[in-house]
Curated annotation (Swiss-Prot):
InterPro entries: IF5A-like (IPR001884), IF5A-like_N (IPR048670), NA-bd_OB-fold (IPR012340), Rib_uL2_dom2 (IPR014722), Trans_elong_IF5A_hypusine_site (IPR019769), Transl_elong_IF5A_C (IPR020189), Translation_prot_SH3-like_sf (IPR008991). This is Eukaryotic translation initiation factor 5A-1. SUPFAM superfamilies: Nucleic acid-binding proteins (SSF50249), Translation proteins SH3-like domain (SSF50104). It is found in: Cytoplasm; Nucleus; Endoplasmic reticulum membrane.
Length: 154
């Protein structure tokens, strides 16, 4: 009976976001806009009006898809900020459009797809050329994606 239970992908139940006051957010920081983790690329504050608070206008780029999102909120309100984890993995192979990655601790993971666009093409080209590369993987709000690559130091 207990053989069909899989505990390998559990987490400690920690939240994928934490609250931060709007006025404390900064450009190049991260925030959740329309339910997506975004990097803040533009921010402006309007003055306190006759009725109500100063407003903060934010423009963010989704860290996974590159889409642009905008939001306006009172400066005293809290916004969610995603917990972002960044890890470097050594690329050891590519199997059926999935990256085979080796972590610092020696664990191998093969569950990440080759990213779309130029980054994916660059990873494929460098792998086929036999270069040793490190792939940077971003993890936020239970989503993961390869976002960068760099040559390994010898």
């Amino acid at each position: 009976m207990a053989d069909d239970i899989d505990f390998t992908s559990g987490d400690a139940g920690a939240s994928s976001t934490f609250p931060m006051q709007c006025s404390a957010l900064r450009k190049n920081g991260f925030v959740v806009l329309k339910g997506r983790p975004c990097k803040i690329v533009e921010m402006s504050t309007s003055k306190t009006g006759k009725h109500g608070h100063a407003k903060v206008h934010m423009v963010g780029i989704d860290i996974f898809s590159g889409k642009k999102y905008e939001d306006i909120c009172p400066s005293t309100h809290n916004m969610d900020v995603p917990n972002i984890k960044r890890c470097d993995y050594q690329l050891i192979g590519i199997i059926d459009n999935y990256l085979s990655l080796l972590s610092d601790s020696g664990d191998v993971r093969e569950d990440l797809k080759i990213p779309d666009g130029d980054l994916g093409k660059e990873i494929l080209a460098k792998h086929e050329a036999g270069e040793e590369i490190l792939v940077t993987v971003l993890n936020a709000m239970s989503e993961e994606c390869a976002v960068a690559l760099k040559a390994m130091t010898k």
